[in-house]
């Protein structure tokens, strides 16, 4: 991949993370179709199937009874969230050895800016990607897929082209053949609802979405994100990897592929968000004393709840318990479409320590 003064962005994604870790914990189920799911729920939902289960049509967010119809031999394993967190922590520690230009986006994926890093590998980006893959496999026994391009959107799409354990590189010469012919539902963060709205106005492929003659009608569907998305898909985006910037707020949210009303499943998704924002908090050497959680319903009505802490913290467990308590107060067995976590009123960790020393 030639640089030509463009950024080189890598997207790293652990393959079938929950299912793979659970499989490592239960080697007796190796080569069996397995899925992590909510065993005790009245409306049990699949959280993460392994690739063998996926070959039967089993998908994340699918009701367990339906997954069992598709794959009668499917083995359901309970969530082991503390262990997932441990694997996630070690994964990001390994990546951090390569560069501090890392943006963690969930418990099992991140972006890195490899523009300068690749120079240490004879400007051979595939050599760098292969080295990272091998180290993750040797140390954690996990496979990862890597997508490489000149912005985050296309790098993430590249990852999906060659899963599992793949390395996909999309440069300017390949984007037309590899990306523009794809269905719009392959675009990151374009959910099922927006995809259906675009289908309704006869927009099916990415090349149709970026066509100038369709701008007006697509803008009515996508609103303010339209132009940034088109810039990304055309390679015009200048968005940086978030690394050592000073934040006023650190937040992360997830729109579900399907609306959820299962407390267990929503809690699992929320746990991932909490881990993501606390990882960012620590990486930036910041602390917070104010947290908030927000949920959005299928009607697009939004509910927000905030809590002021009595002291500054960057501790995962403290933030986890505070957010969990807020969620228990605000959640009333409703169906929700999106959940988000925000850490507010951030200060540098060193400044908090200075304040504490004044009272020693």
From Swiss-Prot:
It comes from Ureaplasma parvum serovar 3 (strain ATCC 700970). It is found in: Cytoplasm. It comes from the Bacteria. The active site is at residue 109. GO terms for biological process: DNA-templated DNA replication; error-prone translesion synthesis; SOS response. PANTHER family: DNA POLYMERASE KAPPA (PTHR11076:SF33), DNA REPAIR POLYMERASE UMUC / TRANSFERASE FAMILY MEMBER (PTHR11076). Poorly processive, error-prone DNA polymerase involved in untargeted mutagenesis. Copies undamaged DNA at stalled replication forks, which arise in vivo from mismatched or misaligned primer ends. These misaligned primers can be extended by PolIV. Exhibits no 3'-5' exonuclease (proofreading) activity. May be involved in translesional synthesis, in conjunction with the beta clamp from PolIII. Its cofactor is Mg(2+). The gene is dinB. It is an enzyme of class 2 (transferase). Pfam families: IMS, IMS_C. Residues 9-191 form the UmuC domain. Binds 2 magnesium ions per subunit. This is DNA polymerase IV. Its main location: cytoplasm. One of its GO terms (molecular function) is DNA-directed DNA polymerase activity.
């Amino acid at each position: 991949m030639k640089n030509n003064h463009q950024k080189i962005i890598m997207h790293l994604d652990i393959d079938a993370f929950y299912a793979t870790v659970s499989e490592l914990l239960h080697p007796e189920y190796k080569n069996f179709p397995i899925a992590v799911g909510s065993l005790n729920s009245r409306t049990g939902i699949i959280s993460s199937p392994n690739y063998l289960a996926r070959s039967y049509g089993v998908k994340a967010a699918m009701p367990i009874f339906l997954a069992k119809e598709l794959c009668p031999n499917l083995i359901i394993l309970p969530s082991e969230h503390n262990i997932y967190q441990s694997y996630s922590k070690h994964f990001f520690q390994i990546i951090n050895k390569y560069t501090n230009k890392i943006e963690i986006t969930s418990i099992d994926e991140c972006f890195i800016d490899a523009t300068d890093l690749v120079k240490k590998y004879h400007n051979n980006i595939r050599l760098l990607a292969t080295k990272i893959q091998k180290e993750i496999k040797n140390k954690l026994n996990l496979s990862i897929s890597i997508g490489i391009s000149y912005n985050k959107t296309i790098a993430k799409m590249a990852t999906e082209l060659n899963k599992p354990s793949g390395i996909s590189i999309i440069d300017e010469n390949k984007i037309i053949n590899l990306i523009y012919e794809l269905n719009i539902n392959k675009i990151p963060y374009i959910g099922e609802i927006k995809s259906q709205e675009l289908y309704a106005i006869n927009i099916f492929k990415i090349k149709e979405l970026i066509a100038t003659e369709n701008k007006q009608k697509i803008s009515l569907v996508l609103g303010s994100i339209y132009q940034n998305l088109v810039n990304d898909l055309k390679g015009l985006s200048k968005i940086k990897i978030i690394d050592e910037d000073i934040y006023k707020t650190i937040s992360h949210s997830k729109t579900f592929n399907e609306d959820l009303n299962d407390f267990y499943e929503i809690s699992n998704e929320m746990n991932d968000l909490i881990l993501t924002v606390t990882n960012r908090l620590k990486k930036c050497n910041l602390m917070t004393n104010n947290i908030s959680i927000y949920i959005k319903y299928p009607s697009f009505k939004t509910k927000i709840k905030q809590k002021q802490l009595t002291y500054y913290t960057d501790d995962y467990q403290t933030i986890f318990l505070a957010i969990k308590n807020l969620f228990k107060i605000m959640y009333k067995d409703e169906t929700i479409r999106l959940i988000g976590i925000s850490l507010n009123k951030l200060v540098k960790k060193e400044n908090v320590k200075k304040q504490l020393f004044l009272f020693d």
